[in-house]
Regions:
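Membrane-embedded alpha-helical segments of multi-pass membrane proteins
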Residues: 28-46, 83-95, 163-171, 217-225, ...
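Transmembrane signal-anchor hairpin modules in multi-pass inner-membrane enzymes, especially those
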Residues: 1-74, 80, 91-93, 97-115, ...
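Extracytoplasmic catalytic-loop and juxtamembrane helix elements of membrane-embedded
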Residues: 133-152, 259-274, 294
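Hydrophobic alpha-helical transmembrane segments
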Residues: 321-333
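Transmembrane signal-anchor helices characteristic of membrane glycosylation enzymes that use polyprenol
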Residues: 25-28, 119-123, 245-257
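Membrane-interface helix caps and helix-loop-helix hairpins in membrane proteins
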Residues: 74-82, 209-210, 259
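Long extracytoplasmic/lumenal interhelical loops at the membrane interface
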Residues: 262-276, 280, 286-321, 340
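Alpha-helical transmembrane segments of multi-pass inner-membrane proteins
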Residues: 108-141, 147-148, 155-230, 241, ...
Length: 346
């Protein structure tokens, strides 16, 4: 109760709602959606969403985009896509409200909350992993990552790959806090916080290994390197590049340590087939796509591999939204990129 009273004394009602929304991300996704929807409709009633759109340049394109992809999904009877379209509208709108109420203290508290709850997710994932081992009559502790998705830990994040994506964010946030604490030679002044952040980072990296998601590792290394570049830590950037190169060399020499190495050839073949199916559908629906989750909606038509998306950040947007859809939302993103550029120059 003291924690709740403390938060209420430091933040207004909307800011407290944001902390609840962040915490809800660590619950099963259907509970997360319900909590976010309750908060969203509360803000609509309070006029917060309307003010967010009025005060944010090019934000009207969010409504145009969401309406377009919703109608496209309905036209093609892509019902999961129709639901996700409404989710896009809700989440985009919530970010506009956040911009109105953002403060350095709120931002820092949100990051601390995510870091703390990532420990909860890690503990849950390890317990989940122990139960997975018991399904194979493996007593004690074995560091084995299975190929089948149902035997890879996900910590309530829908599936192992989604949990791996979240871990990338957790580690990036920890890295940001590390950079912040070591800025201007402040290492010794924050030694306790740095040690805690380091331990939490290692815990999350261990759980990332348990997810068996191989592509998360180079993506994470690249993301941290970009953070160093933006922070002008060129020596550290060179260091992380060297570590990354050493890691590549190690796995080339010792491929048996790559998670799920036994099916890597099959995995590459599956990815290739997924992309081929996606490209086939793009050829016939290149203007509007078929809405969010298009791959999940169409894979059976092409005898494709069953999965939720096309596993490619370049193919999937075109597959789902088409050229017209991407052009509709482009002004909003361009405006935000300009704003970020101006911020970086100051």
């Amino acid at each position: 109760m003291d924690i709740i009273k403390n938060l209420k004394s430091r933040f207004d009602s909307v800011q407290c709602d944001f902390l609840i929304a962040i915490a809800a991300i660590f619950l099963p996704f259907y509970i997360t959606v319900v909590i976010h929807a309750i908060i969203f409709f509360k803000w609509i009633k309070q006029g917060e969403v309307k003010k967010g759109y009025e005060e944010t340049k090019r934000s009207k394109y969010i409504i145009f985009f969401s309406a377009l992809i919703f109608l496209t999904s309905v036209f093609y009877q892509n019902w999961p896509g129709a639901g996700v379209s409404l989710g896009y509208l809700m989440l985009y709108s919530m970010t506009l409200v956040y911009r109105r109420h953002a403060s350095e203290e709120l931002f820092d508290t949100m990051l601390n909350l995510v870091i703390g709850l990532s420990v909860f997710a890690s503990v849950w994932a390890i317990i989940e992993y122990i139960f997975i081992l018991r399904q194979f009559d493996l007593e004690g502790w074995y560091l084995v990552v299975f190929n089948a998705p149902q035997y890879r830990t996900n910590a309530m994040f829908f599936n192992a790959n989604y949990y791996a994506m979240m871990i990338e964010f957790f580690v990036a946030i920890c890295f940001y806090k590390f950079l912040k604490h070591t800025h201007n030679h402040g290492f010794m002044n924050h030694i306790k916080e740095i040690v805690i952040i380091g331990l939490i980072t290692l815990l999350n990296l261990f759980c990332l290994y348990l997810t068996g998601c191989r592509t998360a590792w180079p993506a994470l290394a690249g993301g941290l390197a970009i953070m160093l570049l933006f922070n002008r830590n060129y020596k550290s950037f060179g260091g992380i590049c060297a570590v990354g190169a050493a890691g590549v060399g190690f796995f080339i020499a010792k491929p048996q340590y790559i998670p799920r190495m036994s099916n890597i050839v099959k995995y590459l073949g599956v990815r290739k087939h997924i992309w081929e199916v996606a490209i086939q559908n793009i050829k016939t629906h290149f203007l509007f796509g078929e809405g969010p989750m298009t791959y999940w909606h169409i894979y059976a038509q092409y005898n494709g591999h069953p999965t939720q998306h096309s596993h490619n950040i370049f193919i999937d947007p075109v597959l789902c939204f088409g050229i017209i859809g991407l052009l509709v939302i482009a002004p909003f993103f361009i405006e935000n990129i300009k704003r970020l550029y101006r911020l970086l120059r100051t």
